[in-house]
Amino acid sequence: MKIYLSGSIKETEYRKEVKDKYSTIFEIKDPLEDVEKRINQKELDIFRKIGFSASARDVVDKIVEGDIELIKKCDCLVVFMNMYSAGTIMEIRIAYDLDIPVYIINPSRSMRKDPWIIYHTNLFFDSIDSCFDFLRHTYKQ
């Protein structure tokens, strides 16, 4: 089973924990690792320095289009979400539109009152372990 890891790029501990604990059971797809295959450090530095501009447009396209292609190859989206992140919200919507299940790990429970997040989510979990226990039992991994 292929799982796309979604969430703020600041959530590095979540990504590390998931890969350390579950990469032998599931095929974990981390877009932050995948993006390194699509753009080089020089392109990334230009984007971070300038932000949106004509010269950075190609970099933005490579990032977003690559993430969308990676989502299409996955069986579900697992999202760690305690704060709003534009990219994360877009990934949720894309998965929803593709009928790919969306599972949100939200320890603070802050997202469980947002009608838009609820609408596009299959299930919420309080912890990483509870989410992956569900996936293991549901998908017989």
Briefly describe each language-model feature range.
Residues 1-141:
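Conserved catalytic or regulatory cores that recognize and/or transform ribose-phosphate-containing ligands
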